[in-house]
């Protein structure tokens, strides 16, 4: 149980991509005071968590209404996860110029969605809830742990950014990218195995 919790927490922490999004937060919030930055980070993280919970609560029923199958969830989640992994592995040293256009305080977009909770996070979460390998309580517990670790990471965004520097953060982000790419491949293999009943063995 603890091993599964650790694996899921690591997966969701990588999906929240708080380390990879540090330059984005630093660039968007640099004009605000430290106290204001902390309030914005907390608010945006809460928005991101509520968005994910909203999809967990109502998303499954909605997709069942559309007759979306488990293999479709797994395959789509794998593709989105793979796309996110490729973007993480191809990350560029600085994104500050991209966000100079935002003059006002960011509310929900782009920090809560899609920077913290994006399509890959939502689809992967729904896929894990739908396939039933892990108890839903375990998945929700892992999400809350990953969210808490992500919040702590973002609270110290400026300090971590200075400590590791751009190259150090890039190395960490690419390491997470490789892990996500492997998870994406596993999800797609699960989808093919389930759809065609070919007996692919997947460790829980």
Curated annotation (Swiss-Prot):
Residues that span the membrane, as ranges: 8-28, 46-66, 68-88, 107-127, 138-158, 176-196
Compartment list: Cell membrane
Keywords for this protein: Cell membrane, Membrane, Transmembrane, Transmembrane helix
The name this protein goes by in its record: UPF0056 membrane protein TC_0241
Primary localisation category: membrane
Similarity section: Belongs to the UPF0056 (MarC) family.
Annotated InterPro entries: Multi_antbiot-R_MarC
UniProt source species: Chlamydia muridarum (strain MoPn / Nigg)
Alphabetized Pfam families for the sequence: MarC (PF01914)
Record carries keyword ATP-binding: no
Record's bilayer topology term: Multi-pass membrane protein
GO cellular component, one term: plasma membrane
């Amino acid at each position: 149980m603890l091993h599964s919790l650790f694996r899921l927490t690591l997966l969701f922490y990588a999906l929240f991509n708080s380390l990879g999004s540090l330059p984005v937060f630093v660039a968007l919030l640099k004009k605000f005071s430290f106290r204001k930055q902390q309030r914005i980070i907390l608010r945006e993280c809460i928005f991101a968590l509520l968005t994910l919970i909203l999809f967990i609560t109502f998303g499954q029923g909605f997709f069942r209404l559309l007759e979306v199958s488990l293999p479709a969830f797994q395959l789509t989640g794998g593709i989105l996860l793979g796309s996110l992994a490729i973007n993480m592995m191809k990350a560029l040293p600085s994104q500050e110029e991209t966000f100079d256009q935002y003059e006002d305080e960011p509310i929900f977009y782009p920090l809560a969605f899609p920077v913290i909770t994006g399509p890959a996070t939502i689809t992967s979460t729904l896929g894990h809830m739908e396939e039933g390998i892990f108890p839903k309580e375990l998945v929700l517990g892992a999400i809350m742990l990953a969210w808490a670790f992500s919040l702590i990471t973002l609270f110290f965004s400026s300090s971590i950014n200075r400590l590791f520097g751009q190259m150090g953060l890039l190395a960490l982000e690419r390491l997470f990218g490789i892990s996500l790419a492997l998870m994406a491949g596993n999800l797609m293999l699960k989808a093919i195995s389930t759809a065609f009943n070919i007996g692919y063995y997947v460790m829980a």
